[in-house]
Structure formats: C-alpha cells, structure tokens
C-alpha cells in the first residue's frame, strides 16, 4: 500500500466494526486505525476492487460509502464545476495570485477539501473518527496513484487524524484559512443525502461540540475562518460573521482576521 501523508495525535478508543478477518489487507487497515472486530457491529468495512467501503449492515440495499477523488461526482465537478468562480473558492479567498493554505477541520468524505485542492490550495484534512479517517486515507492512496491527478494530489492534500483543531497547533505550520462544515440536520431528501446522513449520523453522531470549534479555528487561521452552514442554520457559536456568501441551499459564513495577500 502506498505511503499516505497522514499525521495522528491522540490514540482513540478501539472502534468496533465487522470485517472479513481472513482478508490481510482489511486486517492491516483495521489494526492501523484501531478498529476491532465485532460480529454484532452495525458497520462493516469491505475491501473490494482495490477500494475500501463502509456498509451499514441493517440496510443492505444501501451502497457502500467510499472516498473517491478520481471518478464520479467529484471528478465531474473538478472538470466542469466553475473553477475559481465557485462560492467556496470565493469564501476562502481564492483569487489571482492567491492560493491559501487551508485546514479543513471537519473533513468528512473530503469533497470540499478536494475542490479547494483542485483549484490550487494546499489542504490539510482533519478527521477525528478513525473509520472516516481510514476511508479518507484509502481515497488519498488511490488518488496519489492516479496518472491524471496524482502529482498535484500528493503536493496539496494531506490527512491529519486528531480529536480537535487544537491539536493542529502542534504542527507549527502557518495556516491561512480554516474551513469548517459541522454536521447539521439536513432537510434535503435526496437519495444521496439521505444515505450518507443516515450512515454518518449513526457512525459519528451529531457534532454536539461544533460551537467549540470556532475559537480554536480563529486562533489557528491567520487570514479567515469559513463556516459552511445550511441556509436555515444559526450562526456557529452565535457569532455573527464578517460576511456571508449565499448559495441555493447553503451559505458560507466568513470570519475575516486579515486581508488575503
């Protein structure tokens, strides 16, 4: 398996999952992320066609959850998604001559981080849940090996497995922008959102500590903090942003500390 740019801080408690114990690759992945076999666990990890997938065992009709930076929706968005004219690009301050270094403090499946990296940003993805981090690492491994995007992916995207943004201070790296997208109850009933929200909410639970992310994010970012919210959500931690960029269903609350240069 190719080496992945991954940093780890706190050692999490072992997380129970179901997996094929006769498959050495799965055994290695689970050992690396301290995932322990449990015959009654609600989630199963599979490794098929060189890809790690997560399955909710009581909903077998659901497709597996996978991190894929090479094909599918994220690849289409990279090629046809509007480039630096996208709202997320404006929110983080991307402009001619400015490609900020970004920490995505709530990486999830890494889609927003990938958009920013594809536009030239260097992005460190922070993910605290070991199962999600394992999926991200597998997605990075395959992306790093891809002939089309592998070179710049290795340069621009890293994974940091830690329990909070405060741990990132130990990296001693200057960060221009911290990007946050805390899990929030979605009203969208599309199949994709329903599937992923069902899986994620069961797996990781709600971001009950989301309000506590703003202060360490502001301390870490030298230029700005960007918070992605559903259009109906309240301000994070009750703090009014410096400016708001609205999209059809979401908004980006921007907390400016200094000008982008």
From Swiss-Prot:
GO molecular function: rRNA (guanine-N2-)-methyltransferase activity
Protein name as annotated: Ribosomal RNA small subunit methyltransferase J
Species in which this protein is naturally found: Shewanella sp. (strain ANA-3)
Compartmental location: Cytoplasm
Gene3D superfamilies linked to this entry: Vaccinia Virus protein VP39 (3.40.50.150), YhiQ-like domain (3.40.1630.10)
UniProt superkingdom: Bacteria
Entry GO CC: cytoplasm
Catalytic activity line of the entry: guanosine(1516) in 16S rRNA + S-adenosyl-L-methionine = N(2)-methylguanosine(1516) in 16S rRNA + S-adenosyl-L-homocysteine + H(+)
Described function: Specifically methylates the guanosine in position 1516 of 16S rRNA.
Binding site for S-adenosyl-L-methionine: 111-112, 127-128, 163-164, 181
EC number, as in UniProt: 2.1.1.242
Family designation: Belongs to the methyltransferase superfamily. RsmJ family.
Pfam families xrefs: SAM_MT (PF04445)
SUPFAM superfamilies in the cross-refs: S-adenosyl-L-methionine-dependent methyltransferases
Keywords of this entry: Cytoplasm, Methyltransferase, rRNA processing, S-adenosyl-L-methionine, Transferase
